[in-house]
Amino acid sequence: MDEGSRGWILGSYSSYEPRALKRATPWVTYTIIVVNVVVYLITSAPSGFIAISSWWVEVGGFAPILLVVDSVNIYRFFTSMFLHGDIFHIFFNMYFLYLFGRGVEGALGSKRYLILYLLSGIGAAIFHTAYSYLLGGARALMVPAIGASGAISGVLGAYLILYPGTKLTACTWFILPVCFTLYSAYFLLLWFAFQVFYGYTSVGAGIAFMAHAGGFVAGIALLGLLADRHRIRLLRALSGGGSLFGFIRYVFGSVQQREGLSIGVKVAVALLIFLLSAGALAGTFYSMEYQATFDVAKISVSKDGDYSVGYVFYQWRHMRPILLGRDLVDPNVRVLLNRLYAAGLLYEPGYSGKQIRIVGEMLHGVIPVCGTEVAIVIYIDEFIGTYDERGLLVEGRGTIRSPIINVIERPFFCSYEITDDIYRFDFSLTTYMGVNPAPLALEFSVVSLLLSLVSLYIVLWRDKELVITPVGASTVGSEGFVPL
């Protein structure tokens, strides 16, 4: 395939008229923003557009363990990129995409840019999985991750290599707002360093820092594979007098132009990527050594018409199942699990190898709350369950009714009250046996290592051929304001 046909397939403008290239509209960036906003409006409507509904997180979020449970969950690589937790989450993600995405799309062309965006999101999920297993163990793979941050981080990584010489106005707040201007290379280096530092030190913080770092690395690696060098050279020449795409403006003065990244930035970025590479290598060996097998239960429940789905995990100790992950699921799923457990329907050695049916019975159980055991009544309208040879429920469905315990927890204080209302739960449960996440973590650790090494190669030896606006350019301005 010749150069021209390859450029046509991926949207290269190498043979296009220069002025059209210079003024190209970033339609993919705008479209991604619109799609994300529309999805957010749909998924957050039940909360008045303040935060996403938990049901969408359960069905569309990326929980790595679910790839092991059922390969059909591969769709979560993509759906998770378009889900956002709350209004601030989507606002800042879309703002950063708008700020940095337009220039990267202009440099790559729309089709190549879309490929980089989507593959960076997948790369971010791969890093997230590998480092979650290394730093947090198998339980960390149960937590669903959502957001476009990983894909956008790939755009930031590409922007660092393409436009290190653009200037951004950054603002932070210390009593009063303090604003200053700096090269994008320095801002992105600082941002990347924060992700790596907090990724290693803030496990379980509720933010997928390693997904951000992994997306950034994937973006650099993919840029080296997707960039049309012919197009880059043309844009580099066009940047010498005027503006690019209507929002990046330059004047080349007497300052001597330096190609590629500055030595300091290059060394710092390379060091950070090396730290990620070391972690990926450690994750490779850790995944080979540490094997943990779980039984995974998928629960679908409707509480008075409010539908939820969730996953919990059993780990066997001393011949009894320890239920993990109840604190990570939707409240309706958690309440149902507590009732089934209290009623002796999740695990009962006396039911080993049997199928049972219960209709119209009232059972009593206890639930641990605030350091004590609270008696609760459970009405079994209907229950059909199949148990394995250990007495673990592997298939179950039915309808139960029960009051709810409202718990109030504060520092040094815990109280509860049992509601007078009785709530109905219609549910189904399926248990997947012998789930081992170590092979998945091993594969993803190897991929993370390879992406890190490729990006390291790009930063150290290929940045000069990919740069469009080096630091040596005197930047008149670029439409960029970033919060710190």
Q: Each predicted region: which residue ranges?
A:
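Non-catalytic terminal regions of proteins
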Residues: K266, E289-S300, G360, V366, ...
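A detector for small-residue-rich transmembrane helices and their helix-helix packing motifs
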Residues: D2-S308, V312-R317, R424-D463
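Juxtamembrane interface at the cytosolic side of transmembrane helices
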Residues: L450-L484
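A cross-kingdom signal targeting lumenal/periplasmic-facing segments of multi-pass membrane
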Residues: M362-N406
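N-terminal leader/transit sequences and adjacent low-complexity N-terminal tails
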Residues: N338-Y341, L346-V359, H364, P368-G371, ...
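Extended, hydrophilic extramembrane loops/domains of integral membrane proteins
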Residues: G391-Y432
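Membrane-interface segments at or immediately adjacent to transmembrane helices
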Residues: S287-E361
